[in-house]
Amino acid sequence: RLFILGEIIHNPEVNEQIGALGIRNLLGREKQAEVNELTAEDVVIVPAFGTDVTTLAEIKARGCQIVDTTCGDVMSVWKRVRQNATEDVTSIIHGKASHEETRATASRAVLEGRGHYLVVLTLADTDYVCDYIRKGGDRAEFLAHFAGAMSDDFDPDLHLRRVGVANQTTMMRGETEEVQR
């Protein structure tokens, strides 16, 4: 049996063609099966966006053959956020918090219990973070503003002291460059 982790690309026609080939989806809106249903005889395709470390570990534990098509640019971003974690640098990830790639990147920013991340989508989000770094602010308001877009134990008063920028590779390059400034 063949499975895929979410969409191979954000194109409904292509994803319908994949489904017509009998490849079943394990994640996302079009989910057709559960990871706990997998056996060692199954093949699982990891799309170019990659997947989070927990899902990957669950699939490996089931003994499946994995076809990893994660984009090299995505893996470069993962390397950066892992390095940030080892240096106690918080990764500011420019992207959509719910996007598969951003979730995969965020999961690598907190590996081995080290590291933190915060996802910013807009330049207004970035300005909000920069203002908090420069002037401080209401911690509860900050946490509410970025709910669902930060590591579990994120504390802006502690985790914004040293930051590094990473990005969801599908974001506009110019926007990410603005976030970095």
Place the predicted regions along the sequence by residue.
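The feature marks the mature, well-folded catalytic cores of soluble enzymes
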Residues: R1-R181
